[in-house]
Every structure is written in C-alpha cells, then in structure tokens.
Amino acid sequence: MEFFESAFWTGFLWPLIIMVAESVLVLVVLLVAIAYILLADRKIWAAVQIRRGPNVVGPWGLLQSFADLLKFVLKEPIIPAGANKGVFLLAPLVSCVLALAAWAVIPTNLGWVISDINVGILFIFAISSLSIYGIIMAGWSSNSKYPFLAALRSAAQMVSYEVSIGFVIITVLLCAGTLNLSAVVEAQHVRGLASLIGLPQLTILNWYVWPLFPMFVVFYVSALAETNRPPFDLVEAESELVAGFMVEYGSTPYLLFMLGEYVAIVTMCAMATILFLGGWLPPVDLPPFNWVPGIIWFLLKVFFMFFLFAMAKAIVPRYRYDQLMRLGWKVFLPLSLAMVIVVAGVLHFAGIAPK
C-alpha cells in the first residue's frame, strides 16, 4: 500500500500508465476508422463512375480493407539490389509514425485529448513539415529514377503549400487568441457572429468558416496538395512516375506508406473541423442538437471534410506541375497574406480582438 501512496506512483508511474492506455486506445480507434475511410474513398469513387466498388468481402464489402491488410502482411517484402536497405526500410516507418504522432494533441471532444498542450497547432504544423523526410528517404534509398524524381517533386510541393497553411493558422490565431486546439473550439462557442447579433444559441454562425471562408478554401486546397491527393498527386502520377516514390515498395512497407497517407488526410480533415467548423460543437446549442455527444458532431464534420477530399479525387483532373506551383506561389500566397492583414485590421479597428 505504501508503494501506491508514494510520489513515484502517484506523480509519475500512474500518469504514465494512463497516457499509454489513452495512446493505445486512440491508435486502435484510428486504425479501425482508417480501414473504413479507405473503403468509403473507394465506394465514393465507384459511385461517381457508376459502378459498385468493393462488395464481396464481408457484407456490402465492409471487410475489404481487412482482407487487403492480410494480403499485404503475408506478401514477401522485396528490396532492390542497389537500394540502401536501412534507409529503404526506415522510410515507411518514419512516414507512418509521424502521421500518427499528430493525434497526440488533437481533441475529439471537450477534455478528450492525450496531451492538451498550448501550442497544439504548432505541433501539428511541425509534424506535417517533418513528414516530407519519409518520402525523401524513400525516393533516395530506392536507387531508381522514378522514386527520386517523385521525392524531389514532393519536397517542392509540400514546402510551397506549407507557407499558405501557415498564414491560415495565423488568421485563426488572430481570431481565437490561442494556439491551443481545445481553446480554439471554445472560442467558436463563446464569441462570433451569433454573439454579435444576440443569438448565442445559433453557434453555427460563430464558426470561423464564415468570416474566414477564403482561408477555409485555401486550407482545403493546400491540404490536398500537402497530402498528395488528387488533383495534386504529381508525386504518384501513374501516367508519369508509375507509383512515384513507392515504385520499389511492396508488402508491409507499402502498407505503412498508405496508412501514413490516409492518417495524414484524416488529420487534415480534423484540423479543418477544429479550425473552421467548430470542432465538437453542435450547430445549434438547443435541444435536441445539444443532446448529441460532442464526439458524434466531431466525427460527422470530419467525414464531411473527407467527402470533399474524395470528391476532389473523383471529379477534378490532375494539374500540371507548373500549374501546381503557380497556384501555390502566385495565388494562395498573396491571397493568404492579404487575408492576414485584413483580419488583423478588422479585429483591431472594430475593437473585437481577443484579449
């Protein structure tokens, strides 16, 4: 009993056990969610093309992702003769682990977060910046021209659009007055358009998507480019680079790359939900809307954002590389910089800047 009352147990070991348990729970839930999000992506693409999509494994094809998992795990990983074996195998692990690490600070409900740090937005921004290393390592270590060219493209593409995402974060910071993700959501609950017009229960009007709609569009398109999703999948352009930086990969390493890609996509959807769509807040703070648990609202908004990602893949043709760069540097960069200046000016001169 003395051990369980000691400072070592109460101050270090027990909080550590709780944090590990929370991390494992988030990891399991996230991996299961990714399995069905991948299935939804394939189903949406199939529906646009007027076909059924996966519908054989399990009822309505619900077990298709798990069958694919089994297929990849049971395959033999083949390493090219000229590849750097250590870096070649480390690259998919780096890509996957960095994508999963971002979920340590993402709140899915009030108090539902592993680590509620005050610089959560900067943490995720830093993690997304580091994810390029996995792709560069894969492209260089494969000792092949297609992966190397894809890695160079990816580096330029991600750097170009991270600048715009950074300005988006600054505008949200100006409006919310904090970099804490939970506090950003709460700021959309207590102040905004609904409060100004005297209808505080109509919380949907407080969401930053309305006053910052141009920045929402910039964030959405930049997130597509950041995660190498169509129409900005120049890194994996099948008609040019076969499979891009993943040309030489198969089996479990390829699975880890795909897992990291979809986790990054869901992370961007969650960030859009928190920054612009009010996180776990209901659209109307009245019954029966506020009877629904916050986690349900959060998931619905994340799925809505993913639907937008999937529809972009299904209906928008791929950009040329020069068009991609021009959009990032000549359109989004000036627009986002101008919006930062406008938002700061309006908040200052209207006297509504957060204290």
UniProtKB/Swiss-Prot annotation:
The keyword Transmembrane helix applies. Its main location: membrane. InterPro entries: NADH_UbQ_OxRdtase_su1/FPO, NADH_UbQ_OxRdtase_su1_CS. Keywords: Cell inner membrane, Cell membrane, Membrane, NAD, Quinone, Translocase, Transmembrane, Transmembrane helix, Ubiquinone. It catalyses: a quinone + NADH + 5 H(+)(in) = a quinol + NAD(+) + 4 H(+)(out). The chain crosses the membrane at residues 17-37, 86-106, 119-139, 165-185, 204-224, 262-282, 291-311, 332-352. NDH-1 is composed of 14 different subunits. Subunits NuoA, H, J, K, L, M, N constitute the membrane sector of the complex. Belongs to the complex I subunit 1 family. This is NADH-quinone oxidoreductase subunit H. It comes from Bradyrhizobium diazoefficiens (strain JCM 10833 / BCRC 13528 / IAM 13628 / NBRC 14792 / USDA 110).
